[in-house]
Structure formats: C-alpha cells, structure tokens
C-alpha cells in the first residue's frame, strides 16, 4: 500500500523567516547620487595614482601607502600599479636585519609581500628572538609592532614555527595590554583579536578601518574622503544587484511553495559579495547568488524535509537533468526542479554568446556530485548510521558545498577559461584545503543544533567515536585541521603558481566568508540575527557619513 502524506514523518527544522521581507525590492536606485559620486571618485583616483607612481617615494613610505589603500578598500583601483611597486621592492632584497626597520615595519612588509604572492622568508623575524628561543620581553610594550606581527602571522605556511610562536606571543600580549592602549590603536587591537585581517571579509574590514583611520592623527584627509566616496558608490551598485536578485527570488515564489526551506537570498548575496566586491564582477555576483540560493533549498530538502523514497527520485532527476523527469517527482519539489533547469538554461544561453558554454557544463556536473553526496548523507541519517570519520569526511567535503560554489563563482567571470574549471574538477590541494575549512568550521558551529534534531552522522560524533575523544578534544582537533588548511592555502597563493590568481582569490575569499559567518561558533547563515545582520546593514543599508 502506498505511503500516505499523513503517515510520512519528516525531519522538519523550523527555520526562522527572512529578516528582510521586501526591504531590498523597494530599492531607490539613486542614479543621480551615483553619477555624482562616480565623477568625484574619478577625480580623486587620478591624484592617488600620482601618489603611488611617484618615483621619489621611499620603501617605507610607499609600503605604508599601499597598506593604507588596501585597508581603506580602494586598492582595487590600482592593482596593476601596486603589483609593479611590490615586484620592484621585493627584488631589492632589502636587509631587514638593519635596525632601521622596526617590528611594525618588518611585519607589515612581510604581510604585504605574502598577500601578493611573494615568497619572503619568515627568518626576518629572528632578530626578535632571545637566547631561549622566545620572543623578547621588551616587545611587550610595543602595541603597534605586536599588532603588525599578529596580522603577519596569519599568512604563515606549514613548518614556520617562528610564526606559530609569533601568533601565540602576540595574541597573549595584545589581550593583556589592549585595555591600556590609547584609541584608535586600542580599537584596532580589539577588532583584530576577534577578526584577523587575513581571515576577514575585505568590505567589512574596509568599513571598520575607515572609522579607525578617521581617528588617526596622521590620517590623509584626501585618502579618507576617497575611501568614503568609493565605499558609498560601491554600496549603491551592490544595492542595485541585491534589488535584482531579491526581485528574481520573489517572482520565483519558492518561499511559499517550499516553506520548509531557509529564506536567505539576502544572506546569499552577502556571501557572493564576499567572493568579489569589485564593480567588474557584477554579473558574477548575481549568478553566484542565484546558485547559492538554489543550493540552500536543495540542502534543506535533503536535510530537513524529504524522505528517502522522495530523495531517491529527486537524486535521479538531478542526475538525468531533463525536464521530462518532472512527472516522476513529488509535487512539492516540481516547481523547484523546473526553476533550477530554467536558471541553467539562461546561464548557458548567456555564456554561449561569449564562447564559454563549457562553464555551465562544469557547474552542472559539480551540482550532480553535490546532490549524490547529499543523498548519501540523508541515507546515513535515516538509517541511523554513523560512518568512520574518514568515510564521513570524504563525503562531507562535497556536502559543504564549496566545491560547487567555487565552480559557480567562475560562471560570470569572463577571464575564467576552461583550464580553470578543469583544475577545480581535479580537486587540487588549495581547493581541498578550502573544503576542509568550510567543513570543520561548519561542523563545530552546527553540532549542538543537529544533535537536538537527532542528527547522528555528524563529523564531531564520528571523530569522538573513532578516537574515544571528548567533545572538547574533537572541537580542538577540528580547529587544528582548519589552521593547517589555512597554512596550505597561504602556501598555494605564493608565486610561482601555474594557476590564475583570479581563481586563487575566489577560493581565499570563500574561506574568509566562513570565518565571518561562523564567528564565535555561531551558524550565522541559519540564524543571521546576531552575526550577519550588522554586517548586512553596514554593507547594503547605511552609507558612510561624509
């Protein structure tokens, strides 16, 4: 006898509704204000270009300027010029053992060179190590230098013990001296201890630094004005894009058709903006937002609504990728399946016009892989099966979604060629490192909620059973895995690299979003009120006061 709807026991999650309603559908484009801002930015841009290219600027002054531009969020206007400067400075082979270069300067230069892929040695910090192999006690009064060392240490790779020690020393000392520092340095330290620069979302970090820089007695008013204007101009563009995807989402009306799923289109746009915020990636942001939003529904269908018979059919339908499969699907998922195929038809048509139809093919194949892994996970849950950690992790690296989202992040990037998609399909070291970070940090943040919902096949549970470990030991191990994976990402970003820097930056920025979204072991995507709401308001609602 067929199972009736009444008899079906569904694993309903009862997700909270969207925080935003129709707020971003009612967007005022502000075209006149944008035009005015754009003209002002272009004028200021010429002046800053002269500052960067000035031949008379010395190493220390030029590096300080580059750091300020990057932290104010305006360096994307001058990427070529900054790279040329850094290449020139790196090839000078500066002797950083010279007493002229203090801890602040050496740490800043190390960080900038590493951020731009230069293989500068961590041995340059050796002059601050005492006879016992520890950082010198005298450094504990140098708040500015310690903060610079702290930020630099996050770009370490495996085996750089001196930077592991630097992070431990700087973190402990900064926590101790922060209450005694003067503003704005104290504010900068407190923020950095919560959110290291290298792990942070570039736009959030720019917003924060603008307010700190404004308090700086040595600030350049010209740069500050440029940063504020540019921030607000970019915000106008992002609001237009958010308006577009919000309208698309409302017209699909999947919220009413699939009430079990999370309604998070705004948070999905926040995610996409974190991958690339620059104006030239406007189309890519919109395409990525749509794919993330659809993935979220698939995730909730497997995790929080579907029963195994339905999921068997749905998995087959995704594999076959044919509109005729709709007849076999459960009624509730038919509108979604149709919308998903139509979305990719639109992508394929658009990409075919520029000779990049292969991009959609790689994205669809990656989505099929994701769905197969979701299916495995769902069967584990329904069967009450707790896999060995190695078996769990192999599948969970796919269900973290980052393999698929890294691929779809390149859909709207015209410079992304087929070789880039082929590279990702082979799951290179940098991508695997990114998947590991996403997986273990997500597992830590969602463990308690999943446990309450009866989810037994979690990474934490699997690790604890295999290793006879406590919850505290498992969490510590997961953080250790994430730390090592970050070191691998840092290594893979160094030159020479056969891979496109554009692609490497997408992976790096995706990991930064994980650090922000799951801050404090909170699931900021599922419950955005505490973690993401303030960021979304700062980025997409409130302009910076001039």
UniProtKB/Swiss-Prot annotation:
Keywords of this entry: Lyase, Magnesium, Metal-binding
Binding annotation for Mg(2+) 1: 299, 303
Tissue and organ expression note: Highly expressed in leaves. Expressed at levels in flowers.
Pathway in which the depicted protein is active: Secondary metabolite biosynthesis; terpenoid biosynthesis
Enzyme Commission number(s): 4.2.3.199
Pfam families: Terpene_synth, Terpene_synth_C
Superkingdom of the organism of origin: Eukaryota
Cofactor: Mg(2+)
Function per UniProt: Sesquiterpene synthase that catalyzes the conversion of farnesyl diphosphate to (-)-5-epi-eremophilene.
Complex formation: Monomer.
Family: Belongs to the terpene synthase family. Tpsa subfamily.
Name the UniProt record assigns to this protein: (-)-5-epieremophilene synthase STPS2
Annotated source species: Salvia miltiorrhiza (Chinese sage)
The organism's taxonomic lineage, starting at the top: Eukaryota, Viridiplantae, Streptophyta, Embryophyta, Tracheophyta
